[in-house]
Amino acid sequence: MYVFCICDLSKRFSLSFQPNFLCELGLQKQGFFHVAGVDEVGRGPLAGPVVTAAVILDKDRIPDGLNDSKKLSFLQRNRLYHEILQSALAASIASLCARTIDQSNIRKATLEAMRRCIIGLAVPAHYVLVDGRDIPSELPCPAMALIKGDQRSVSIAAASIIAKVTRDRMMECAGQVYTNYGLEKHVGYATLAHRRALDKYGPIVGLHRYSFAPLKERYRNDVS
C-alpha cells in the first residue's frame, strides 16, 4: 500500500528563496531514485485546456534558474523549457480540453491530467511530488502533495515551466484560428479584453468553458 500525504511547507519555511532539490535528495536516500515533480497550468481561465506536466530531473544536470513559472519572464521560461527537455531523465505532458472540464469539473479534470502525465513518463517514477493539496488516484507509486511546491522543489518548478510554455503555445495557435479574441495575449484568462470579445462575438464552442462564470448562466443553453 502506498502512503500519500500533504505537506504544507509554507508554514515552516520562508518562501523567499529559490526552489531546491533537497526533498528529492531525501527521497532518493530512502530508495526512491526517480522522483517526479508534477504541476498544472490552466485551472482558472475561461477558455482552453488544463495542461499538466511531470518531470524527473537528473540530479547532475539540473538547469540553472529553475523557479515557479509565474516568477519567470517569457524568455526565461522558453530557455528553461528547452534546457529541461534536453537534460531531464523524463518529461511528460497531458491536457484535457474545455469540453471535458465542463463534463466533470476543473478539479477532477486536473487530477486526471496529472495521472495521465505521471503514467506517461518514459522512465517510471518511484515517487511523485505534486504541487498543491490534491493527489491523483490510481498512481503506480507513492506521492506527496506539497503546498506551494513550485516554490520549494525544482522538479515541480520544472514541471510548471513545461506546462506553462506548452499551454501558452496551444493558446497562441488557437489565437491564429480565432483572431477576434486575443487568445495569444490573455491565453484564456478573464481579462477585460477577453470579456469584451465574449460580449461581442460570444463563446467558442469546444474552447470556452461553459461551466465557468460568467459563461455558465449566460450561455448554458448554447451547449448541446
UniProtKB/Swiss-Prot annotation:
<dbReference type="GO" id="GO:0032299">
    <property type="term" value="C:ribonuclease H2 complex"/>
</dbReference>
<dbReference type="GO" id="GO:0006298">
    <property type="term" value="P:mismatch repair"/>
</dbReference>
<dbReference type="GO" id="GO:0003723">
    <property type="term" value="F:RNA binding"/>
</dbReference>
<comment type="function">
    <text>Endonuclease that specifically degrades the RNA of RNA-DNA hybrids.</text>
</comment>
<keyword id="KW-0378">Hydrolase</keyword>
<keyword id="KW-0540">Nuclease</keyword>
<feature type="binding site">
    <location>
        <position position="39"/>
    </location>
    <ligand>
        <name>a divalent metal cation</name>
    </ligand>
</feature>
<keyword id="KW-0479">Metal-binding</keyword>
<dbReference type="InterPro" id="IPR024567">
    <property type="entry name" value="RNase_HII/HIII_dom"/>
</dbReference>
<dbReference type="InterPro" id="IPR001352">
    <property type="entry name" value="RNase_HII/HIII"/>
</dbReference>
<keyword id="KW-0963">Cytoplasm</keyword>
<keyword id="KW-0464">Manganese</keyword>
<feature type="binding site">
    <location>
        <position position="131"/>
    </location>
    <ligand>
        <name>a divalent metal cation</name>
    </ligand>
</feature>
<dbReference type="GO" id="GO:0004523">
    <property type="term" value="F:RNA-DNA hybrid ribonuclease activity"/>
</dbReference>
<dbReference type="GO" id="GO:0005737">
    <property type="term" value="C:cytoplasm"/>
</dbReference>
<dbReference type="InterPro" id="IPR036397">
    <property type="entry name" value="RNaseH_sf"/>
</dbReference>
<keyword id="KW-0255">Endonuclease</keyword>
<dbReference type="GO" id="GO:0043137">
    <property type="term" value="P:DNA replication, removal of RNA primer"/>
</dbReference>
<dbReference type="GO" id="GO:0030145">
    <property type="term" value="F:manganese ion binding"/>
</dbReference>
<dbReference type="Pfam" id="PF01351">
    <property type="entry name" value="RNase_HII"/>
</dbReference>
<feature type="domain" description="RNase H type-2">
    <location>
        <begin position="33"/>
        <end position="224"/>
    </location>
</feature>
<dbReference type="InterPro" id="IPR022898">
    <property type="entry name" value="RNase_HII"/>
</dbReference>
<dbReference type="InterPro" id="IPR012337">
    <property type="entry name" value="RNaseH-like_sf"/>
</dbReference>
<protein>
    <recommendedName>
        <fullName>Ribonuclease HII</fullName>
        <ecNumber>3.1.26.4</ecNumber>
    </recommendedName>
</protein>
<comment type="similarity">
    <text>Belongs to the RNase HII family.</text>
</comment>
<feature type="binding site">
    <location>
        <position position="40"/>
    </location>
    <ligand>
        <name>a divalent metal cation</name>
    </ligand>
</feature>
